[in-house]
Amino acid sequence: MSEPAENCSPRWKDEAIQNGYIPSYLDKDELCVVCGDKATGYHYRCITCEGCKGFFRRTIQKNLNPTYACKYEGKCVIDKVTRNQCQECRFKKCIAVGMATDLVLDDSKRLAKRKLIEENRERRRKEELQKTVWDRLEPTQEEWDLIRMVTEAHMATNAQGNHWKQKRKFLSAAGVKEDKPEEIGQASMANTPEGNKVDIEAFSQFTKIITPAITRVVDFAKKLPMFCELPCEDQIILLKGCCMEIMSLRAAVRYDPESETLTLNGEMAVTRGQLKNGGLGVVSDAIFDLGVSLSSFNLDDSEVALLQAVILLSSDRPGLSSVERIEPCQEEFLLAFEHYINYRKHKLAHFWPKLLMKVTDLRMIGACHASRFLHMKVECPTELFPPLFLEVFED
């Protein structure tokens, strides 16, 4: 077997090194219009070789043409042999064939152009990298199964499904007035300080739907195997912690900009004022603000379901004994959630972090409601509170 030759390289590479790079728009045998050497492309509006391109650029950038002087009265023939013998005639021929002095950039413009090219190159690199990231982060088969499971759990426990607009009834139809408490009539108002007044009639309407709303949250949780595998005590803590947050989320995603109402439990459409007067006070503002904000997100059922699962499996609820089991469950949903968002809405900048911030908003609503609940117990007759409502929200 013969030994390989030293410095061997493919023939095409040797030819490329010898001939130089030729753009695809040039014929293979195209010649420089200044000196007749092999052309390498359009330079300053003419087809030239690299040598004449560089000569012309240096002449303009350094303003050298006044220093050029021909020894033969400006009548030199310029070709690839004589081009370096007379700079004046070479420059005159550059001008004569049409090379444009205005296309030669000075140092500052050249640096700016180079910077722009580098920035564009870096931008394209990042776009390609981002595209690769999005492509790579499509949910795995296991994550798709998790998404399908939690979506089915949500839809099975979500009152009226996607037909809530057709099925809803406005609270005003039940004879409950709205907005200013003083317009509702003092007879129906609990005797409490201004700003904390509760419309007893509205509150009694809300209590009719609160038990089925809570029951649906519990049913949703019980459809998640990882939740059911937790100790009973931890299940209770998680449900008590997330119940108001999930009910608020379910109401917020049913905000209707046209009527400026939220639909509670898929059936009762209420205004901001009615919800406030019905017992929630300032908490109603937070829920409505969340609804207004979420209306621009156009969340689908899977996104709402995943958001609920993340809220349910919050391992920082006080009193939990199985934090080390709950944390991985929440992480599993978070990762599937992120991949699902990246897969579906990768063209929307910062969509995932903005959506994740809504978890913080919902936690704030839950905390505010816990404080508000103490006032409601003072303001409203005890017999109006459904047993399940008290069981969930009392410490």
Swiss-Prot record:
<dbReference type="InterPro" id="IPR013088">
    <property type="entry name" value="Znf_NHR/GATA"/>
</dbReference>
<dbReference type="GO" id="GO:0004879">
    <property type="term" value="F:nuclear receptor activity"/>
</dbReference>
<comment type="function">
    <text>Nuclear hormone receptor that can act as a repressor or activator of transcription. High affinity receptor for thyroid hormones, including triiodothyronine and thyroxine.</text>
</comment>
<feature type="binding site">
    <location>
        <position position="76"/>
    </location>
    <ligand>
        <name>Zn(2+) 2</name>
    </ligand>
</feature>
<feature type="binding site">
    <location>
        <position position="369"/>
    </location>
    <ligand>
        <name>L-thyroxine</name>
    </ligand>
</feature>
<dbReference type="InterPro" id="IPR050234">
    <property type="entry name" value="Nuclear_hormone_rcpt_NR1"/>
</dbReference>
<feature type="binding site">
    <location>
        <position position="216"/>
    </location>
    <ligand>
        <name>L-thyroxine</name>
    </ligand>
</feature>
<feature type="region of interest" description="Modulating">
    <location>
        <begin position="1"/>
        <end position="31"/>
    </location>
</feature>
<dbReference type="InterPro" id="IPR001723">
    <property type="entry name" value="Nuclear_hrmn_rcpt"/>
</dbReference>
<feature type="binding site">
    <location>
        <position position="216"/>
    </location>
    <ligand>
        <name>3,3',5-triiodo-L-thyronine</name>
    </ligand>
</feature>
<feature type="binding site">
    <location>
        <position position="265"/>
    </location>
    <ligand>
        <name>3,3',5-triiodo-L-thyronine</name>
    </ligand>
</feature>
<keyword id="KW-0804">Transcription</keyword>
<dbReference type="InterPro" id="IPR001728">
    <property type="entry name" value="ThyrH_rcpt"/>
</dbReference>
<comment type="similarity">
    <text>Belongs to the nuclear hormone receptor family. NR1 subfamily.</text>
</comment>
<dbReference type="InterPro" id="IPR035500">
    <property type="entry name" value="NHR-like_dom_sf"/>
</dbReference>
<feature type="domain" description="NR LBD">
    <location>
        <begin position="142"/>
        <end position="395"/>
    </location>
</feature>
<dbReference type="InterPro" id="IPR000536">
    <property type="entry name" value="Nucl_hrmn_rcpt_lig-bd"/>
</dbReference>
<feature type="binding site">
    <location>
        <position position="265"/>
    </location>
    <ligand>
        <name>L-thyroxine</name>
    </ligand>
</feature>
<dbReference type="GO" id="GO:0048384">
    <property type="term" value="P:retinoic acid receptor signaling pathway"/>
</dbReference>
<feature type="zinc finger region" description="NR C4-type">
    <location>
        <begin position="70"/>
        <end position="94"/>
    </location>
</feature>
<keyword id="KW-0863">Zinc-finger</keyword>
<protein>
    <recommendedName>
        <fullName>Thyroid hormone receptor beta</fullName>
    </recommendedName>
</protein>
<feature type="DNA-binding region" description="Nuclear receptor">
    <location>
        <begin position="32"/>
        <end position="99"/>
    </location>
</feature>
<feature type="binding site">
    <location>
        <position position="70"/>
    </location>
    <ligand>
        <name>Zn(2+) 2</name>
    </ligand>
</feature>
<keyword id="KW-0862">Zinc</keyword>
<feature type="binding site">
    <location>
        <position position="52"/>
    </location>
    <ligand>
        <name>Zn(2+) 1</name>
    </ligand>
</feature>
<keyword id="KW-0479">Metal-binding</keyword>
<dbReference type="Pfam" id="PF00104">
    <property type="entry name" value="Hormone_recep"/>
</dbReference>
<keyword id="KW-0805">Transcription regulation</keyword>
<dbReference type="GO" id="GO:0070324">
    <property type="term" value="F:thyroid hormone binding"/>
</dbReference>
<feature type="binding site">
    <location>
        <position position="35"/>
    </location>
    <ligand>
        <name>Zn(2+) 1</name>
    </ligand>
</feature>
<feature type="binding site">
    <location>
        <position position="369"/>
    </location>
    <ligand>
        <name>3,3',5-triiodo-L-thyronine 1</name>
    </ligand>
</feature>
<dbReference type="GO" id="GO:0030154">
    <property type="term" value="P:cell differentiation"/>
</dbReference>
<dbReference type="GO" id="GO:0000978">
    <property type="term" value="F:RNA polymerase II cis-regulatory region sequence-specific DNA binding"/>
</dbReference>
<dbReference type="GO" id="GO:0090575">
    <property type="term" value="C:RNA polymerase II transcription regulator complex"/>
</dbReference>
<dbReference type="GO" id="GO:0045944">
    <property type="term" value="P:positive regulation of transcription by RNA polymerase II"/>
</dbReference>
<feature type="zinc finger region" description="NR C4-type">
    <location>
        <begin position="32"/>
        <end position="52"/>
    </location>
</feature>
<dbReference type="GO" id="GO:0002154">
    <property type="term" value="P:thyroid hormone receptor signaling pathway"/>
</dbReference>
<feature type="binding site">
    <location>
        <position position="89"/>
    </location>
    <ligand>
        <name>Zn(2+) 2</name>
    </ligand>
</feature>
<keyword id="KW-0675">Receptor</keyword>
<feature type="binding site">
    <location>
        <position position="32"/>
    </location>
    <ligand>
        <name>Zn(2+) 1</name>
    </ligand>
</feature>
<dbReference type="GO" id="GO:0008270">
    <property type="term" value="F:zinc ion binding"/>
</dbReference>
